[in-house]
């Protein structure tokens, strides 16, 4: 009897999620339309923070999903800056990208914060030292990247994008600069990716009608 009941509950759960996602529940419109980098593709942006444990847990799942994306979908990460103490890790993200070590150190910096607990995500001096050590690059070169002329513009854009998205937390996925979903809205990490797939398919259908 217990086995039958468990089977029924699992079936019910799968059927309840199989229904079409609801606007305002599982996903929502962005507060403002956010311009995308690539007009020819459907852009998916992950808004995240290296200091966020939920982003850390989401990262390997998201990575597997990104590998399977069709050619008409473009994925990128953008650091979220809803408050000043998130800025040091955003600065690290852009500096590592400029130095060409972004992909190499992406998982490592997450691990340093959450697994090893050897890096304070709000301590800019410690973060700069970590990037210098792990990249093997000259400290002056790393400092120049952290304080480059374009850095403030990148940080301002990231902060503006987070506000325009209407996101209230991270990780949040923004699709086509017009829709957002998250594990909180969708009911889990895998579910948020299913919602993202749903939105991507609808955006594709709308584009094909034009």
Q: Which role fits each region the language model picked out?
A:
Residues 2-84, 159, 163-164, 201-210:
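Extracytoplasmic thiol/disulfide redox context detector
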Residues 20-30, 119-125, 195:
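Periplasmic c-type cytochrome electron-transfer domains
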Residues 50, 57-129, 198-206:
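Structural alpha/beta surface segment adjacent to cysteine/selenocysteine redox centers
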Residues 55, 85-86, 120, 155, ...:
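Alpha-helix N-cap/helix-start motif
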């Amino acid at each position: 009897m217990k086995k039958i009941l468990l089977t029924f509950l699992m079936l019910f759960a799968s059927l309840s999620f199989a229904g079409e996602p609801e606007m305002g529940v599982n996903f929502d419109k962005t507060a403002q339309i956010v311009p995308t980098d690539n007009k020819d593709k459907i852009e998916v942006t992950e808004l995240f923070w290296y200091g966020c444990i939920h982003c850390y847990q989401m990262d390997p799942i998201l990575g597997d999903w990104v590998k399977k994306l069709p050619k008409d979908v473009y994925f990128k990460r953008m650091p979220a800056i809803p408050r000043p103490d998130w800025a040091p890790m955003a600065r690290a993200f852009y500096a590592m990208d400029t130095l060409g070590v972004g992909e190499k150190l992406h998982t490592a910096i997450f691990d340093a914060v959450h697994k090893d607990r050897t890096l304070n995500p709000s301590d800019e001096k410690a973060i700069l030292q970590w990037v210098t050590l792990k990249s093997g690059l000259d400290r002056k070169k790393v400092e120049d990247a952290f304080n480059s002329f374009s850095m403030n513009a990148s940080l301002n854009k990231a902060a503006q994008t987070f506000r325009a998205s209407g996101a209230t937390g991270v990780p949040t996925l923004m699709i086509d600069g017009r829709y957002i979903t998250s594990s909180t809205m969708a009911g889990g990490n895998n579910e948020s990716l299913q919602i993202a797939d749903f939105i991507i398919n609808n955006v594709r259908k709308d584009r094909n009608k034009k």
